[in-house]
Amino acid sequence: MLKSKFKEKFIERYIKLTDFKKFEEYSLKFLRRSIRVNTLKISIKELKNKLKDWELTQIPWCREGFWIKHKTLERRDIGNLPEHYLGYFYIQEAASMIPPVVLNPKSNDLVLDMCASPGSKTTQLASMMENKGIIIANDISHDRLASLGINLQRCGVSNAIITLSKAQYFNLKFDKILLDAPCSGTGAIRKSLKTLLTWNPNSIKRLSNLQKKLIITAFNCLKDKGILVYSTCSVEPEENEEVIDFLLKKFKNAKLEEIKLKIKRSPAILEFKNKKYSKEIKKCLRIWPQDNDTEGFFIAKIKKD
């Protein structure tokens, strides 16, 4: 019998949460390549005409998103295409396109992308806003800001201000906030098997504590009636449902909203390690890799009442 690439403690945990054989199968498969058309520079129709050698399949939950495959050759090097260098499209995993779609920023909004690097979601937000309004694209890592700046420039983003700061120091209130939080990446194992080597329960606990601090900061930065979207590419309950449950208990004016998308979803986890979470968390979107053949993702939409 072949030995699993997953640690024993990992298997013990996940076998209680999902169909582990399916999770393992999809986590060890190559991701389908996907792109998002950058409508700041080109229309969907125009890009399709330029990529005639490539088969583009619509991603149901994102109008500008497509899975991409060469019609005749076994090519995966879409990053080398001139259209990519010119910023006509962004190479972005299909599930990663969901949080900006859920946030749904308008052209007159003041938006905070709290952990913005390397910029996939920032550029998506800018495209949705048609380069209007203002995006504060923030990160606390100086090294990561370099890639953010390059991607914003390549994609022709002109409504974003890059900041290197902790969000609690902003003397601003935002209409919309995206908190795509640092996480364990357990939903994105198929992108990097290194995740399996670095995974351990102690690091999950540390990340959960950080995420709780970040979501409190984000909620405090939100205007009344504003919208906060929290997301991770983790499938750990402690990084997802537990963080949202923590926020709901701390702020009575934090209200979860339903997420309605054309996507297969799995039930939110309402109990883990003898902890019971609010039934409101059923409104969150939990996606396992096997649900839609994507990365695993978790998304919550919160309104400040």
Residue spans of the language-model regions?
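S-adenosylmethionine
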Residues: M1-D305
